[in-house]
């Protein structure tokens, strides 16, 4: 059982994430047929067939505290509006984490702060039998450390972070990180922690492709947003632009005023799904100002801002607390004949609780 108190949440026993459902395969599982080699210039693709869907679910009370002790009978899950059967087996699922850090030239004064959090990632995030890899990106995508459970190697890799060019290939870094996570054993949970600005600079891949891959591989994306601290150091804040996410889709913090629209969002039924569908379909050109928000929101993750070493460390702790306080709901979709976007909605049959989970996943239409 997970303890919602901050002090005890990080104990070894609380780092075991609960999984509802027999995990035939981790995340959304796939059968992949051999494919002929593709020309190097093409964007990386993922060939997938959905079998089992896993939906990490965070439950908060009115004060914003994690709610523990729920059972399978407290949850209802809907896939495209159709109720799905959740099985009640409980298992332990160790964590595989990629830490992807923007290492561009404008971060010269900020990287020393980020270099110090390697030990915290091991102590506060990974948990029992956890492993991490470290990736740096500017105009290159560099793997500084492949997956390891060795805290010393993780810390050493973080200390290798150095500023490079002015580019920041955020989308390409997400795609490559998802590929790394997809190769991990099937019994591991997959998480990507981005430490970056909100906007991509010079990626070759598309947001749609990276997001589709993350959802199909059941990768939860969390982010530590460095935009505020960049503005603090450079004195040049980027001009604000309207969010691509409707105002009603914004998260209401614990203790905030609830409205009918915000309550719909917390049950995953808000009106921001159409924008996500347009991203997947690429039916028209859509300007997405904040790619990080799209990655975190639509994979069930969350983003945190920081402006100091202390707030950075608190953000890392908050990520660990959430990951190890979640319920992992698994089910076999019974409606895979419905091609396109499958919206996931989770309800808790107890009053005045806030629920956050992944919004859904994309399924190719069957011939």
Language-model-detected regions and their locations in the chain:
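Bacterial N-terminal signal peptides that target proteins for export
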Residues: 4-23
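Hydrophobic h-region of N-terminal signal peptides that target proteins for export
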Residues: 23-31
């Amino acid at each position: 059982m997970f303890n919602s108190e901050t002090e005890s949440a990080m104990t070894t026993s609380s780092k075991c994430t609960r999984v509802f459902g027999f995990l035939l395969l981790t995340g959304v599982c796939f059968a992949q047929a051999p494919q002929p080699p593709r020309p190097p210039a093409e964007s990386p693709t993922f060939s997938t067939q959905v079998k089992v869907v896993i939906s990490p679910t965070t439950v908060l009370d009115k004060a914003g505290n994690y709610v523990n002790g729920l059972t399978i009978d407290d949850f209802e899950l809907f896939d495209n509006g159709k109720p799905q059967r959740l099985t009640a087996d409980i298992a332990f699922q160790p964590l595989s984490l990629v830490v992807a850090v923007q290492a561009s030239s404008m971060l010269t004064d900020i990287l020393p702060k980020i270099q110090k959090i390697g030990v915290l990632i091991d102590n506060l995030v990974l948990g029992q039998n956890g492993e991490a890899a470290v990736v740096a990106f500017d105009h290159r995508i560099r793997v500084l450390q492949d997956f390891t459970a060795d805290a010393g190697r993780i810390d050493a890799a973080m200390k290798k972070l150095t500023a490079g060019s002015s580019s920041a290939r955020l989308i390409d870094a997400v795609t490559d990180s998802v590929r790394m996570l997809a190769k991990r054993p099937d019994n591991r949970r997959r998480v990507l922690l981005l430490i970056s600005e909100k906007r991509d600079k010079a990626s070759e891949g598309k947001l749609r492709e990276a997001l589709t891959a993350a959802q199909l591989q059941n990768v939860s994306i969390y982010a530590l947003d460095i935009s505020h601290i960049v503005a603090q150091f450079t004195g040049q804040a980027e001009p604000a632009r309207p969010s691509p996410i409707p105002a009603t889709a914004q998260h209401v913090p614990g203790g905030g005023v609830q409205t009918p629209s915000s309550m719909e969002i917390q049950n995953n039924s808000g009106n921001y799904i159409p924008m996500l569908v347009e991203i997947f379909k690429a039916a028209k050109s859509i300007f997405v100002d904040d790619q990080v928000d799209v990655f975190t929101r639509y994979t069930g993750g969350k983003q945190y801002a920081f402006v100091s070493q202390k707030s950075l460390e608190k953000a890392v702790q908050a990520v660990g607390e959430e990951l190890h306080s979640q319920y992992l709901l698994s089910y076999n979709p019974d409606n895979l004949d419905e091609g396109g976007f499958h919206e996931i909605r989770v309800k808790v049959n107890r009053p005045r609780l806030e629920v956050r989970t992944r919004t859904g996943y994309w399924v190719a239409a069957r011939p």
